[in-house]
Amino acid sequence: MIDWYSIVDRTRNLRGNSHWDKPENVIASARYSYLLNKWDGQPNYVEVWVEKDALVDIVGQACIPLDTPYFSCRGYTSQSEMWSAAQRFIDQSYRDNCYIIHLGDHDPSGIDMTRDIQERLQMFGADVYVKRVALTMNQIETYNPPPNPAKLSDSRCGKYIDEYGDESWELDALEPSVITNLITNEVTAFRDDEIYQAVCDLEKRGKEELKMIERNYDRAVAFLESEV
């Protein structure tokens, strides 16, 4: 049985305005939304890219707590989106290094996409290293996901078969916990934890200040009205 909460339809969404019962509830919402950029002051800049949109929520489970940007390529990324990505990395060029952690299927196209991302970003002038972390042959041997026949219609199939044989494997076949742990380990390896903790502490103080305002909202309003 699959839990209904595990099924996501990303193409059909109810849209509408947000509402609050009282003004102080807006402050509570702001406190929840108040986040500092955990990569401020870091020597490295990191993004996580995944081949398939179907896996973007699983990737997000790792990236959101790490405050790390993540992106669904949906196959070969469009030229316009690749240009936009290059501009992001160029904007981060003051840092020591920029990295993309890339996850994709182990098939002719999935393997080639890592190369494609690297080369097209370089073409647009971005100095970034694309690190493929999944799916790899070591992971296939470790977790033994079910194989599929390599697509003979793929123009990259010949080179793939010469190197890996006539079987391919999908990233989806890995347990979500394996994917999230893999991303967490890769991202934190590029992060200075001392700098990260300093930003977290500053963020916590900001949230505490907002909570104090929220709790004393009526008194704050009364004071402001008395000053009018």
Language-model features, listed with the residues they occupy:
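Catalytic metal-binding/acid-base residues of hydrolase active sites
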Residues: 107
